[in-house]
């Protein structure tokens, strides 16, 4: 803790002065009266070492002290001044809030290395060591920082690696700068702002993304272990397709390959690829089954249509063959119809004629007997009676004619 520190300021690199000139310039600046406070301010606390800086009693009364950087690029100061500067910078950092916590550790270390460097030159004057009270306070602060960083490191180790790294959560001030500041703090300088900062460091928890993503990966691994294996044993050989064989072989290959992979991120990527590929194959299988069913229905419909078409052709041929028969039957029907009508008419005529004869006979029986007289009106009746006589005469003539021919031949 007794080592010397040096602050580097941007000055004119061409100007060169001796160390004695620098020290005399610095003593004149210290003895000068108070000036308006510039941007670069060193706030000296009450616990600073009085022997390291002349006129300590006068400086305690002054609230601020001006400081003009020398022309030389570096200047040597006591460790007490450096501690006071660190205390003021830490109080400013607490007022800034989250902006100082989001800094990258590499950037903080680089800025710390540029602003604060250990001086390797020979000391010009002796410095008194820091009191034991400041050492004890520094140890307490270190212990608090270590206790705040312990659970964070354990939580980071316990969280499994996600496929895509989540956003980096807001980190507190880097350990190196914190140790440097806390080593110089005293019990009086430990403000409520620093205490609240330490409490917030203890209460920091990993972001929600880090807590949710490992659970999702865990469920994926559990789901992959309890996944459904595509089985071909219960199917008939005619129902098994190329996609069924590909899917079963793909699942077996996936399980064998997954047992050989140890990386969690690789397992998650393999699981995603497997589930997407399996879903695509199952979708293709369902579409193939639907296509097969539609083809079977289509073939059945086509077969029924062919049967009906063949039957239609047969009926047309039969109709063509039976058409002349239909015409013949139609003519026969017409003839029979005419005969039926003629028979009805003849029957009606005969019935009327019979009735007439009956009436005539009845009249003759009732009337007086006398010679019959025939006139022209009775000609039809005479012809009807002579019909039998004329028929016998014609019959005798035919017999006579035939006998004459036979005699001529003899």
UniProtKB/Swiss-Prot annotation:
Primary localization class, coarse: cytoplasm
InterPro entries: CENP-U, P-loop_NTPase
PTM field: Phosphorylated by PLK1 at Thr-74, creating a self-tethering site that specifically interacts with the polo-box domain of PLK1.
Compositional bias annotation for Low complexity: 151-161
Domain of life the protein comes from: Eukaryota
Cellular compartments annotated: Cytoplasm; Nucleus; Chromosome, Centromere, Kinetochore
Keywords for the protein's UniProt record, in alphabetical order: Centromere, Chromosome, Coiled coil, Cytoplasm, Kinetochore, Nucleus, Phosphoprotein, Repressor, Transcription, Transcription regulation
Biological process annotations from GO: chordate embryonic development; chromosome segregation
Pfam families reported for this sequence: CENP-U
Modified residues (Phosphothreonine): 74, 191
Stored PANTHER family: CENTROMERE PROTEIN U
Family the entry assigns: Belongs to the CENP-U/AME1 family.
Complex formation: Component of the CENPA-NAC complex, at least composed of CENPA, CENPC, CENPH, CENPM, CENPN, CENPT and CENPU. The CENPA-NAC complex interacts with the CENPA-CAD complex, composed of CENPI, CENPK, CENPL, CENPO, CENPP, CENPQ, CENPR and CENPS. Interacts with MLF1.
Protein name: Centromere protein U
Organism encoding this protein: Mus musculus
């Amino acid at each position: 803790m007794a080592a010397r520190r040096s602050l580097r300021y941007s000055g004119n690199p061409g100007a060169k002065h001796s160390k004695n000139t620098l020290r005399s310039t610095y003593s004149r600046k210290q003895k000068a009266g108070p000036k308006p406070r510039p941007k670069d301010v060193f706030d000296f606390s009450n616990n600073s070492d009085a022997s390291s800086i002349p006129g300590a009693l006068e400086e305690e009364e002054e609230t601020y002290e001006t400081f003009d950087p020398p022309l030389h690029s570096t200047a040597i100061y006591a460790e007490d001044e450096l501690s006071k500067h660190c205390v003021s910078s830490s109080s400013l950092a607490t007022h800034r809030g989250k902006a100082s916590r989001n800094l990258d550790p590499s950037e903080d270390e680089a800025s710390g290395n540029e602003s604060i460097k250990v001086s390797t030159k020979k000391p010009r004057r002796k410095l008194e060591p820091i009191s034991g009270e400041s050492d004890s306070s520094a140890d307490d602060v270190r212990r608090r920082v270590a206790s705040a960083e312990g659970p964070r490191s354990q939580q980071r180790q316990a969280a499994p690696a996600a496929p895509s790294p989540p956003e980096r959560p807001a980190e507190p001030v880097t350990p190196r700068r914190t140790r440097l500041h806390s080593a110089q703090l005293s019990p009086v300088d430990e403000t409520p702002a620093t205490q609240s900062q330490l409490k917030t460091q203890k209460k920091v928890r990993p972001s929600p993304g880090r807590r949710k993503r490992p659970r999702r990966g865990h469920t994926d691994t559990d789901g992959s272990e309890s996944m459904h294996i595509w089985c071909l044993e219960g199917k008939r050989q005619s129902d098994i397709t190329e996609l069924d064989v590909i899917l079963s072989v793909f699942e077996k290959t996936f399980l064998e390959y997954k047992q050989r992979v140890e990386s969690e991120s690789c397992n998650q990527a393999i699981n995603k690829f497997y589930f997407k590929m399996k879903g695509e194959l199952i979708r293709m299988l369902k579409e193939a089954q639907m296509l097969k069913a539609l083809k079977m229905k289509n073939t059945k419909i086509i077969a029924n249509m062919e049967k009906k078409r063949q039957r239609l052709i047969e009926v047309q041929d039969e109709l063509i063959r039976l058409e002349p028969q239909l015409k013949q039957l139609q003519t026969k029907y017409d003839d029979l119809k005419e005969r039926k009508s003629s028979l009805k008419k003849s029957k009606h005529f005969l019935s009327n004629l019979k009735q007439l004869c009956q009436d005539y006979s009845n009249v003759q029986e009732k009337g007086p007997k006398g010679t019959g007289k025939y006139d022209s009106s009775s000609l039809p009746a005479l012809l009807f009676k002579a019909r039998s006589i004329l028929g016998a005469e014609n019959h005798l003539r035919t017999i006579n004619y035939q006998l004459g021919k036979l005699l001529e031949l003899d």
